[in-house]
């Protein structure tokens, strides 16, 4: 039962972490793209 709970927490936290990193990196990418600083 503990393994199922831990796997559920891990599988639930991975998309949240990816979405959070994407949301924080996307405005910086857009700013750099507008300034043409690739």
Swiss-Prot record:
Keywords: Chloroplast, Electron transport, Membrane, Photosynthesis, Plastid, Thylakoid, Transmembrane, Transmembrane helix, Transport. It comes from the Eukaryota. It is found in: Plastid, Chloroplast thylakoid membrane. GO terms for cellular component: chloroplast thylakoid membrane; cytochrome b6f complex. InterPro entries: Cyt_6/f_cplx_su5, Cyt_6/f_cplx_su5_sf. The chain crosses the membrane at residues 5-25. It is a single-pass membrane protein. GO terms for molecular function: electron transporter, transferring electrons within cytochrome b6/f complex of photosystem II activity. GO terms for biological process: cytochrome complex assembly; photosynthesis. Its main location: plastid. It holds the Pfam family PetG. Coiled coil: none annotated. The 4 large subunits of the cytochrome b6-f complex are cytochrome b6, subunit IV (17 kDa polypeptide, PetD), cytochrome f and the Rieske protein, while the 4 small subunits are PetG, PetL, PetM and PetN. The complex functions as a dimer. Belongs to the PetG family. Component of the cytochrome b6-f complex, which mediates electron transfer between photosystem II (PSII) and photosystem I (PSI), cyclic electron flow around PSI, and state transitions. PetG is required for either the stability or assembly of the cytochrome b6-f complex. This is Cytochrome b6-f complex subunit 5. The lineage of its organism: Eukaryota, Viridiplantae, Streptophyta, Embryophyta, Tracheophyta. The gene is petG.
């Amino acid at each position: 039962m503990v393994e199922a709970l831990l796997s559920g927490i891990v599988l639930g936290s991975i998309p949240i972490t990816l979405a959070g990193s994407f949301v924080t990196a996307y405005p910086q990418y857009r700013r750099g793209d507008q300034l043409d600083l690739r």
